[in-house]
Amino acid sequence: MSILDFPRIHFRGWARVNAPTANRDPHGHIDMASNTVAMAGEPFDLARHPTEFHRHLRSLGPRFGLDGRADPEGPFSLAEGYNAAGNNHFSWESATVSHVQWDGGEADRGDGLVGARLALWGHYNDYLRTTFNRARWVDSDPTRRDAAQIYAGQFTISPAGAGPGTPWLFTADIDDSHGARWTRGGHIAERGGHFLDEEFGLARLFQFSVPKDHPHFLFHPGPFDSEAWRRLQLALEDDDVLGLTVQYALFNMSTPPQPNSPVFHDMVGVVGLWRRGELASYPAGRLLRPRQPGLGDLTLRVSGGRVALNLACAIPFSTRAAQPSAPDRLTPDLGAKLPLGDLLLRDEDGALLARVPQALYQDYWTNHGIVDLPLLREPRGSLTLSSELAEWREQDWVTQSDASNLYLEAPDRRHGRFFPESIALRSYFRGEARARPDIPHRIEGMGLVGVESRQDGDAAEWRLTGLRPGPARIVLDDGAEAIPLRVLPDDWALDDATVEEVDYAFLYRHVMAYYELVYPFMSDKVFSLADRCKCETYARLMWQMCDPQNRNKSYYMPSTRELSAPKARLFLKYLAHVEGQARLQAPPPAGPARIESKAQLAAELRKAVDLELSVMLQYLYAAYSIPNYAQGQQRVRDGAWTAEQLQLACGSGDRRRDGGIRAALLEIAHEEMIHYLVVNNLLMALGEPFYAGVPLMGEAARQAFGLDTEFALEPFSESTLARFVRLEWPHFIPAPGKSIADCYAAIRQAFLDLPDLFGGEAGKRGGEHHLFLNELTNRAHPGYQLEVFDRDSALFGIAFVTDQGEGGALDSPHYEHSHFQRLREMSARIMAQSAPFEPALPALRNPVLDESPGCQRVADGRARALMALYQGVYELMFAMMAQHFAVKPLGSLRRSRLMNAAIDLMTGLLRPLSCALMNLPSGIAGRTAGPPLPGPVDTRSYDDYALGCRMLARRCERLLEQASMLEPGWLPDAQMELLDFYRRQMLDLACGKLSREA
């Protein structure tokens, strides 16, 4: 039965309480039904500064000196209390395990758990993402000492001597707040003449429970040498055990050293098992109540031939010292428990059941008031515990609820709306759960609440409806038990306020002024609510803190929680008001730059060639950085990848259409190659020569193209993929910055506007090509081969490029197959992985042979040799293309031997060299090399076709010589043979042994 059961973990320390006291209102300045403040009998003029009201409170008597005695010049004022600037923070200080008990009941002070530290924290703040979160102590009715509620979010146990970074032994989230139980005055018999004697003599018992099925009910998995810890975890496996109960008593408040100081309380507590049928926040067991003032409640359990008593707050201390006896003590020393003689436990027949020796309960700091005794006989009926000086009698029926210190909305009578809330109550007869259909109760206090009852098995459900604003109590049975609550002010008229009306002045007048007057800690420690500049700065945070959804969180503001829903919503309206003050001063639309002449158009087309080449190389680099399927299989065998990751990166093993991300990127790169050729055809249709293009990365690309997206050769990753999505961003989806589509918009407009772009000769110019065109193009235009010869074919080519890249429009059939959408789908598959997956090899970013800004120089000798060969082959490929176009052919590119040779070099040499470089060390620790960022190429061509082919043969010969200088095995024989094949073919073309077209 909770802490009366075994095992038990006892702890001791102090509690720090920083509760505000100016709201206790001994002079009647505060109307708690409306949250308004009066001064000198009149409503306080909110145009006056709040400090005027604070000075008024300080001027009121009576006043007291630092010794707590009456003193007209003393620093303490009854009107302000001892801590007017309190911020409701609550924490445990130096709370450590003092001893443990298991089945035998004997205290073990040598267990490994002794000395462990316990802590009570507030809730994690999702908005500010804070650590070191403080719990809160809130008095729902500040005029009463039994209306305290603790809002805590986390309970932890850490090893002895633990620091902030030491792993905890146990942690659990606390979902519900818990209120003070068994609040009693006179817990210290001696009175010292201090104006706070009543506070010093208060004792309160608190209890909360944490369920073991909560996802954040966690024991540290590491080993820990403690028998008590082992037994506790074993006991938690019992189906009858719901979790852990933590009970702690607070008493002996420290003497405030000066006004506006937090205070400390002695704290003793125990951690035990929370069993099925027990309330989470009310002590379990048979309840006995005292007959004499100064004594407190107690519970007991009779079972298995033993009786366990919880006397934590039952017996007062005799004396209290003026000051703590040592610097490390936070409260004054207490004398012994009052000597009441041996306490005899009897049943209703008067039979003696157990004897509590005086020496046992006076040894309080050893047992913390939890004592176990042999049972002399089984009890009959109600119980009493008594001596000649004291008596406790059992209260047969006890009804209580875990819902305590409730806040109910007042009715909105204008619209006939009421806002009921339901709570569950449990009734116990002599400690055993019983159904109790008729629970005696009455309503006391300023507020009024309606109660509708419904029985549900052993539990009752009450539907509570606020009827009249103000603090109230539902008094149960004979009045010893009550459910404190507060009906919030009737502020429903404020719901009519519009966003435009709710400016700072409105919010201050209707909400914040009250808190600035009654709770000055904000202006003292955070920022003054009377400062518009601060409130406007933190308008969003103010709404988040005051959101009614967070009322049960420790960080909720106001800490005192008497804010009605209509007033809370004003913070949201104020935030909208502040946000609405930001007016967009729309910049003039950028629009495409106007191209004024044919020469400018040719220059823009050459820039577009550079752009398409630069984009294509980025896709190729990312694709080649992903291992091929065979390499991926090896990674699966090595345990680096899963089979699912292999499928994602490299596709299926049948090498058909599904090639994974690697193949998808290569497909897009191939289509970018076609865009490159289309733009060159546009250029050549103007009478300009073929342009090989210059790939640009980094700052050079930004300067040339004017795009915000960075250009870089980098291995595939989530961030690389995000860059690609941004590169292909459509013009029809609004986004800041210039897009690739914007580049083509100006070119398209120029083809529409400029006259005399095409020569008088009819017929096509440039070259035909029919690879890597999508199926939609084939269905609609099966004869299309990229040809450009007039305005219409030029506009068609531009539309082909932009539709394939961005999709044309959201409702276009091209959108689904566009680069943009395919990349987004690829990104979605990557992001859907349960863990991040980076399939790429650790290749360098922008690898180069020679130092260059924004690039990384490769130092490894073998990699450098292959990079140099790559650069030579890359240049040869473009030289072949340039020579093809130099003689202005009208035939298909696919039939041109020079174009076929260029494509063979791309696939037969550049591709394997790229993959090889991706797998070679770069000379930089942890990074492989990669195909280099190509430099400018020499694409000299000749009007004499034969001469041009002989010059190409010489280039092949030089590359063969360069390749032959490599170490054996660095370059496969097939690639050497391919270079020699085209050396011979170029010579055959030069001397006419082969036709120019296949």
Curated annotation (Swiss-Prot):
It catalyses: 2 H2O2 = O2 + 2 H2O; 2 2-iminio-3-(indol-3-yl)propanoate + H2O2 = indole-3-pyruvate imine dimer + 2 H2O. Its EC number is 1.21.98.-, 1.11.1.6. GO terms for molecular function: catalase activity. Pathway: Pigment biosynthesis; violacein biosynthesis. GO terms for biological process: antibiotic biosynthetic process. Pfam families: Ferritin-like. Keywords: Antibiotic biosynthesis, Multifunctional enzyme, Oxidoreductase. It is an enzyme of class 1 (oxidoreductase). This is 2-imino-3-(indol-3-yl)propanoate dimerase. It comes from Chromobacterium violaceum (strain ATCC 12472 / DSM 30191 / JCM 1249 / CCUG 213 / NBRC 12614 / NCIMB 9131 / NCTC 9757 / MK).
